[in-house]
Regions:
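Beta-strand-rich recognition/accessory modules
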Residues: 595-672
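N-terminal secretory signal peptides that target proteins for export/translocation
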Residues: 1-5
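HEAT/armadillo-like alpha-solenoid scaffolds in large eukaryotic assembly and transport factors
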Residues: 81-93, 154-165, 272-280, 337
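Sec/Tat signal peptide C-region and signal peptidase I cleavage site
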Residues: 20-26
C-alpha cells in the first residue's frame, strides 16, 4: 500500500531541508543583502531582451511591475556604488525611459473592457504594449516605487534630462489625480497612497501630499479601527462588510501589505507631517505587536491564514509584498512597542530572504509561484513566480536603502498572538511554529480546536499545512455506521467550538493585542457533536506542545469509536517509528495495529522534518495504527497518520487522552 504525493511537493521539502541550515542566517549587513540581490539578479537575467530593452516576465499583468522592481534594484545599486550583477546602469536607463514612454504609462483612460479594472488616467496599465490592459492600485504603486528610486539615482545612473523630466511629470500628474488624492481610498489599503505621496515628494520636492493627504489617510484609518480590526487586532480585509464575512476572518498578507506604509512614515515626518498621537499611536503599537507576533514565524515566513483562501494562501508574490512591512518596521522603531521589536523585524526579514534563497539554490532557478504544493485560484504560472523573485530581490535593495545593513538584529523569543472573537492562536518559537483557528468562517477547509499546521524551526512541514479529518491533528468520534458525530478539528461551526486563552490571562478589550513573548501559553476549547462532546486543552512552551482530550457521551447510543490523530507530511516518503519502554524500535507499516501500552514514544518522520510524541496517556486497551488519509486541497502532501483508538464499543462514557509533541528533537534528526 503506497501513498502518492505530487513529486514537486517532496522535492520542495528536500530542497529546503538540504539548503536551509547554511542559508537562513540572520543579521545581514549590506554585503549579505547585495549577495542575495546579486544571486536573484542572475536568476532573472535570462528574462532580459536586449532588442526590446525590457525584462520579459511572461505577460499576464506582471511585466510592468517586474521591470520596475528590477529598475529599483539597479537604482539602489547605483546609489550605493555596488559592483555586481545587481548593478546595471544601461538597463536602468532603458527601463526608466520605457516605463514613462507609452504603455504601460497612459494619459487617457483605457477602454473599460475588464470588469475588475480600476480605470483611471493618468496612470499605469498592466501591460508593456496594450494601453487598454487592466489597471489596479498595485500597478501604479509598484511602477512608481521603482521610478522614484531611479529619480534619486539619476546622477549615478546618468539618466538623460528628458527621462528625468518625464518621470517627474508622470509621477506628479498621477499622484495629483482624483484616483489618488484624498479622500480616495481602496478598502483600507493606506499603504499604496503613502507610497504615491512619498514618490511625488521625492520627484517634485513638494511634500504637500505627504504632509496633508497622508496625515488624513492615517487619521481616517485609525478612527475606523472598529472596521479595520477584530478583537486582538486581527486584520479585516473588507472594512465595510460584516466581521463574519469569510474574507474578514483575517489576512496575514494584506495586514502586512497595509502595514508597509511604515516605509514612508519617517520621510513624512521629516516633511512636516504631524506624528501619530494619542489613541492612534497606541493602536499602532498594538497593531505592530500583533503583526510581528501573529503573522510571522522564526524562519521569516508568514504564519499564514487568509480569508481569501486559495486566491492568496502561500502565493510567493504576496510574500514579497508582505516583507515590506518588515522593512518599514525595522526602520521605524518609534511605531513599535519598543526598540527590540525593530531588531526582531530585521531578523525575520533576513531569515525570510535566506529561506527563499535556499529554495532558489536547490531548485536551480526561480522557486515555484505557490509554496507547499497547495492549489491556487486562479492558477499561478511562471510569470507569477518571476514577479515574486523580483519583489523579494527588491526588498533586499530596500533594506539597504533603509539602513538595515547597519541596524541591530536580534532573534525573537517565543511569540504568541490570540484573537478572542475567532479563537485564533498563533505560536512561533525557534523550534516550531503553529496555529489554532477555532472558527474559519468558511474561508478555507481547515480549522477547529487543534493545531491547524505544524512546521519546524526551518519552516519544514512537520505534520500538516492545513489538513482535515485523518490528515489533521485532533479527535474524531464515529458511530457503528461510520458516521462522524464529532471532530475537534472542524472550524465551520463557531457556535459549537469555542477557544479561550487560559494563560496568560487577559481581559477582552478592543484595540488591544493579546500578543508578545511567552514561556507558557495555554488554551482550552469545547466542541459539541451529535450526542458527544469534547474538552480540549493545549499548552505551548518554547520547546514542546502538550495536549489533552476529554471525550464524553451526551446522549449518543450504541457502539462508538473515538480516535486521536497525529498526521505526517511527504506521502510515501514519511514514516513512523515506535519505541517501547525497553528502547526497542519498530517502523510501523500502513494498516498495522499496535497496543499503546508499553510504548514510550512515537517518531513521526515527515519528508523534511520530524516530531516526537511522548508522555502518552490513554485508557486501558488503547491501540494505534497507521492509516492513509485522502489527498486534500489544503494539505496536498499528506503522509500516513497515526490514529490512536482511545475508546470503542457501547459501554464507554468518557475517554481521557494526553500527549506531548516535541518538534525536530535532536535524537530524531540524528537518526535521519
Amino acid at each position: 500500500m503506497t501513498i502518492r504525493v505530487p513529486v514537486a511537493v517532496v522535492l520542495l521539502a528536500v530542497a529546503i531541508a538540504a539548503a536551509l541550515p547554511a542559508a537562513a542566517r540572520a543579521g545581514y549587513d549590506d554585503g549579505d543583502y547585495w549577495a542575495f540581490a546579486d544571486r536573484m539578479q542572475e536568476r532573472l537575467d535570462p528574462l532580459w531582451s536586449e532588442t526590446a530593452g525590457v525584462y520579459r516576465a511572461g505577460g499576464g499583468g506582471v511585466d510592468p511591475m517586474t521591470n520596475s522592481l528590477l529598475l529599483l534594484v539597479h537604482s539602489v545599486a547605483a546609489l550605493e556604488g555596488h559592483v555586481g550583477p545587481a548593478r546595471n546602469d544601461e538597463r536602468a536607463r532603458r527601463l526608466a525611459a520605457r516605463l514613462v514612454d507609452g504603455p504601460p504609462y497612459v494619459t487617457r483612460r483605457p477602454a473599460a473592457t475588464h470588469p475588475d479594472s480600476q480605470v483611471h488616467a493618468p496612470g499605469w496599465v498592466s501591460s508593456m504594449v496594450d494601453p487598454n490592459a487592466p489597471q489596479h492600485l498595485v500597478f501604479d504603486a509598484e511602477v512608481v516605487d521603482g521610478l522614484a528610486y531611479a529619480y534619486r539615482a539619476r546622477h549615478a545612473l546618468r539618466l538623460p534630462a528628458g527621462t528625468v523630466a518625464r518621470i517627474r511629470s508622470a509621477v506628479h500628474r498621477t499622484a495629483m489625480g482624483r484616483f489618488w488624492r484624498w479622500p480616495a481610498i481602496r478598502l483600507n489599503q493606506i499603504n499604496w497612497y503613502a507610497l504615491m505621496y512619498a514618490a511625488d515628494a521625492t520627484v517634485t520636492g513638494d511634500a504637500r501630499l505627504l504632509r496633508r493627504d497622508l496625515s488624513l489617510q492615517l487619521r481616517r484609518f485609525f478612527r475606523g479601527a472598529r472596521r479595520n480590526f477584530g478583537e486582538g487586532m486581527r486584520f479585516q480585509y473588507l472594512p465595510d462588510s460584516s466581521p463574519r464575512d469569510s474574507r474578514n476572518v483575517d489576512s496575514a498578507e494584506y495586514a502586512n501589505i497595509v502595514l508597509s506604509f511604515t516605509r514612508f512614515y519617517a520621510q513624512a515626518r521629516r516633511a512636516g507631517m504631524a506624528p501619530l498621537a494619542g489613541a492612534a499611536r497606541r493602536l499602532m503599537r498594538e497593531w505592530t505587536r500583533r503583526a510581528l507576533a501573529g503573522y510571522w514565524t522564526h524562519p521569516g515566513y508568514l504564519n499564514w491564514d487568509s480569508g481569501l483562501g486559495f486566491e492568496r494562501w502561500h502565493h510567493a508574490k504576496k510574500v514579497g509584498l508582505a516583507q515590506q512591512a518588515l522593512v518599514g518596521m525595522a526602520a521605524t522603531p518609534s511605531l513599535l512597542p519598543g526598540p527590540r521589536w525593530a531588531a526582531w523585524a530585521k531578523d525575520l526579514l533576513d531569515r525570510g530572504l535566506g529561506w527563499y534563497d535556499a529554495l532558489a539554490t536547490r531548485s536551480g532557478g526561480i522557486p515555484e509561484a505557490v509554496f507547499f504544493g497547495v492549489p491556487s485560484v486562479p492558477h499561478q504560472r511562471a510569470n507569477s513566480a518571476r514577479l515574486a523573485a523580483a519583489r523579494i530581490a527588491a526588498n533586499a535593495a530596500r533594506a539597504i536603502d533603509a539602513g538595515l545593513g547597519r541596524a541591530p538584529s536580534a532573534r525573537p523569543p517565543a511569540l504568541y498572538a490570540f484573537d478572542p472573537d475567532i479563537g485564533r492562536l498563533a505560536v512561533t518559537t525557534p523550534s516550531y511554529n503553529t496555529a489554532v483557528v477555532a472558527t474559519n468562517q468558511g474561508a478555507f477547509p481547515y480549522g477547529g480546536l487543534e493545531l491547524a499546521r505544524l512546521f519546524d524551526g526551518r519552516q519544514e512541514v512537520a505534520g500538516s499545512v492545513g489538513g482535515t479529518g485523518h490528515a489533521a491533528f485532533g479527535a474524531i468520534v464515529r458511530d457503528a455506521a461510520g458516521r462522524r458525530l464529532l471532530a475537534t478539528q472542524d472550524g465551520r461551526d463557531s457556535a459549537s467550538r469555542r477557544l479561550r486563552l487560559i494563560r496568560p490571562r487577559w481581559g477582552v478589550t478592543r484595540g488591544r493585542a493579546f500578543a508578545g513573548p511567552f514561556t507558557d501559553v495555554r488554551v482550552a476549547g469545547h466542541a459539541r457533536g451529535r450526542g458527544v462532546d469534547a474538552a480540549v486543552r493545549h499548552r505551548f512552551t518554547p520547546r514542546a506542545i502538550e495536549s489533552r482530550w476529554l471525550l464524553r457521551r451526551r446522549g449518543a447510543r450504541g457502539p462508538l469509536v473515538a480516535v486521536v490523530c497525529f498526521p505526517s507530511w511527504g506521502g510515501s516518503s514519511a514514516s513512523v517509528v515506535a519505541t517501547d519502554r525497553e528502547g526497542r524500535r519498530r517502523t510501523l507499516a500502513l494498516g498495522s495495529s499496535l497496543p499503546l501500552a508499553g510504548l514510550r514514544s512515537l517518531e513521526v518522520r515527515s519528508t523534511g522534518a520530524a516530531y516526537r510524541i511522548d508522555r502518552l496517556r490513554a485508557p486501558a486497551g488503547a491501540t494505534l495504527r497507521l492509516v492513509r488519509p485522502p489527498r486534500q486541497s489544503s494539505n496536498p502532501g499528506a503522509g500516513p497518520t497515526v490514529v490512536m483508538r482511545v475508546a470503542s464499543g457501547a459501554g464507554w462514557t468518557r475517554a481521557s487522552t494526553a500527549a506531548r509533541i516535541v518538534v525536530g528533537s535532536s535524537d530524531i534528526h540524528e537518526r535521519r
